[in-house]
């Protein structure tokens, strides 16, 4: 028996489909065991709920284009127009551009945001900020990768202030 252990849930940015296709082609049996995605762990780390009445009833999970392209119809700007809670994976090194696109799409610079570094790991760190201060917050805390960003009013629903 061989195990391919993946952090989080392999159905979100886990390349699991490509791996299962190869196993299927070779007629190799396998089991797919779900995990807990970092976006769920991040909500727990921040004691927040992604969907709140009168604030947001939708969660958008996306990423900036990197090694893997993102279809143009799934641009950050088009998703930002919905003003729903947004979770952005795999984009920590592009936070200035992420902020620009979020604002271009309709969020304001003072929209609440958070950066969660290594969600659910022992070295987990959380930073509540705004769309306009994402890059500055990451730089001040030496966060360059392995983080996700949460955007939207649910981030500050029960918080007194954001930086």
Q: What kind of region is each of these model predictions?
A:
Residues 7-82, 122-128:
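Class I SAM-dependent methyltransferase SAM-binding "motif I" and its flanking Rossmann-like core
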Residues 1-2, 15, 58, 66, ...:
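A contiguous loop/helix-start segment that scaffolds small-molecule binding in enzyme catalytic cores
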């Amino acid at each position: 028996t061989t195990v391919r252990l993946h952090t989080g849930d392999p159905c979100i940015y886990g390349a699991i489909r490509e791996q299962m296709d190869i196993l299927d082609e070779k007629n190799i049996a396998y089991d797919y065991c779900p995990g807990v995605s970092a976006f769920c762990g991040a909500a727990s780390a921040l004691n927040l709920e992604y969907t709140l009445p009168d604030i947001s009833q939708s969660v958008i999970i996306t990423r900036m284009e990197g090694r893997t392209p993102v279809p143009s119809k799934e641009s950050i700007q088009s998703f930002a127009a919905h003003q729903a809670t947004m979770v952005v994976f795999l984009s920590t090194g592009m936070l200035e551009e992420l902020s620009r696109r979020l604002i271009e799409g309709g969020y304001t610079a003072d929209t609440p945001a958070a950066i969660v570094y290594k969600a659910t790991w022992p070295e987990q760190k959380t930073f509540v900020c705004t769309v306009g201060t994402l890059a500055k917050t990451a730089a001040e805390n030496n966060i360059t990768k392995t983080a996700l960003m949460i955007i939207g009013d649910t981030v500050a629903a029960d918080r007194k202030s954001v930086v």
